[in-house]
């Protein structure tokens, strides 16, 4: 049973992740997307490695399972971090938060196709239809998505989908320990991001503003490093089902913070779409919990 401190941590995690989108938008004013992703992962890797050392957990990044760790690092960290930075730089930050909330929906579809024990049922179908109807409704709002930026909205959704792909791949090594898997895949994402950042973006030639640099540091230290540690604490104390409730709150914080800090326009269609996405995710999560309790 979650106590008040557990709920506080869940809301804090949602607020931190929800705030990452407007900070990505500010950071992309001065930093290229691959470099932005690289810095985030560098700051995330430090507390993860220290955590494993403290808990005496062996980091298996270069063990015989290295192919799985490297593929997950590519699909679950390097690619989505980069795609989200590309997309968020050209659309409203709260729109990126809402589009990212499709991750559990696309993940449910992929789990039905690629796993044996997470098949579709009526509740999941209803949830997916409601959620994606909300996203499609967003694309009808020409104030928010138009011919100039719709491709970047699609890129953001693609980043979200890669998170789902990474989640499916992680099931292959789910018995390897949460801290080890996260740390090992983070190390591999660094291996992928470093050469591409150096070759394609030449970060030493950038002339970043103070605002962008502060946002980048926030993304690395708080929104990635600290957030992952909070996530581990929630997982270890309250379990996966409780931790996934954070997905309800992230788009809400994304919309509110985008409006407060960037003065982004919120239309009626945006609010309707937000409600639809949250309801859709509710149906999906309820169906999953019913499956768990019936096993």
Model-assigned labels for residue ranges:
Residues 48, 107-109, 113-114, 145-201, ...:
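Transmembrane alpha-helical segments that form core, pore/gating elements
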Residues 18, 49, 73-78, 82, ...:
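Hydrophobic/small/kink-forming positions within alpha-helical transmembrane segments
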Residues 27, 36, 40, 87, ...:
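Hydrophobic/aromatic residues within transmembrane alpha-helices
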Residues 37-39, 77, 81, 96-102, ...:
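Helix-helix packing/entry segments at the starts of transmembrane helices
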Residues 19, 23-26, 30, 44-62, ...:
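Membrane-interface helix-cap regions at the ends of transmembrane helices
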Residues 48, 70, 101-102, 110, ...:
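Hydrophobic transmembrane alpha-helices of multi-pass small-molecule transport proteins
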Residues 16, 20-21, 49-100, 137, ...:
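Specific transmembrane alpha-helical segments of multi-pass solute transporters/efflux pumps
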Residues 1-35, 86, 145-172, 191, ...:
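Glycine-/small-residue-enriched transmembrane alpha-helix faces in small-molecule transporters
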């Amino acid at each position: 049973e979650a106590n008040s401190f557990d709920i506080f941590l869940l809301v804090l995690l949602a607020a931190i992740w929800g705030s990452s989108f407007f900070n990505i938008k500010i950071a992309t004013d001065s930093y290229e997307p691959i470099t932005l992703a690289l810095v985030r992962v560098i700051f995330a890797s430090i507390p993860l490695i220290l955590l494993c050392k403290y808990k005496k957990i062996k980091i298996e990044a270069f063990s015989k399972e290295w192919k799985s760790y490297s593929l997950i690092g590519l699909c679950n960290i390097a690619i989505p971090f980069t795609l989200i930075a590309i997309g968020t730089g050209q659309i409203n930050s709260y729109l990126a938060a809402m589009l990212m909330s499709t991750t559990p929906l696309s993940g449910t579809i992929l789990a039905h196709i690629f796993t044996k024990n997470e098949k579709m049922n009526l509740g999941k179908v209803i949830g997916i239809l409601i959620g994606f109807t909300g996203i499609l409704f967003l694309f009808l709002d020409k104030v928010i998505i138009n011919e100039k930026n719709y491709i970047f909205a699609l890129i953001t959704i693609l980043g979200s989908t890669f998170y789902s792909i990474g989640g499916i791949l992680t099931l292959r090594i789910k018995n390897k320990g949460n801290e080890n898997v996260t740390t090992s895949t983070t190390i591999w994402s660094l291996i992928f991001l470093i050469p591409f950042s150096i070759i394609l973006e030449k970060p030493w030639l950038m002339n970043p503003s103070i605002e962008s640099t502060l946002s980048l540091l926030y993304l690395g230290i708080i929104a990635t490093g600290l957030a992952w540690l909070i996530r581990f604490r929630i997982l270890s104390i309250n379990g996966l089902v409780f931790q996934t409730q954070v997905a309800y709150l992230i788009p809400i914080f994304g919309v509110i913070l985008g409006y407060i800090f960037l003065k982004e326009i919120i239309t009626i269609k945006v609010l309707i779409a937000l409600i639809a996405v949250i309801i859709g995710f509710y149906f999906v999560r309820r169906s999953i919990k019913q499956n768990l309790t019936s096993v």
